[in-house]
Amino acid sequence: MIYLDACLVIYLVEAHPRWGGIVAAAIAASDDRFGISPLVKCECLVGAIKRGDPVLQRAFTELFDRLVSLAMPEPVYLQAAELRARFGLRTPDALHLACAQHHRCDALWTNDDRLTRASHGLARNALQPQSTGGRRL
């Protein structure tokens, strides 16, 4: 299972001109299952709600329904506190990483280099060619 950080989901759904197609192609090319947390859902929906865009909001929720929803029980928050203290991560970043670790995900795809440094190999800046065996995500 690969945990998707909110930034990649946003690039995909909002069809970011530079990254949206790359994210879509990588997901389509992968045999892995993809998971997201309630935090990813929260972060993704903010822009659509703020702009009053129900079509975009629906596009996000339709994608959420096709991904594995990963719960965030109390141990995730306790691990996030450890990660914040040890690596100076912001709370949302620490929660993403802790959730991926808790669910024993094989990878956490992100574009955040701070997560790649703190994760000891779990998180990968998926928009860099070396992060997925030499191919761009």
Where in this protein do the model-derived segments appear?
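Short beta-strand scaffold positions
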Residues: 4, 35-36, 71, 91, ...
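Acidic catalytic patch
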Residues: 66-86
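Active-site charged/polar residues at nucleotide-handling catalytic sites that mediate phosphoryl
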Residues: 30, 87, 103
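Short, well-structured N-terminal submotif of metal-dependent ribonuclease cores
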Residues: 1-36, 48-59, 126-137
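Conserved SAM-binding loop
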Residues: 12, 69, 89, 108
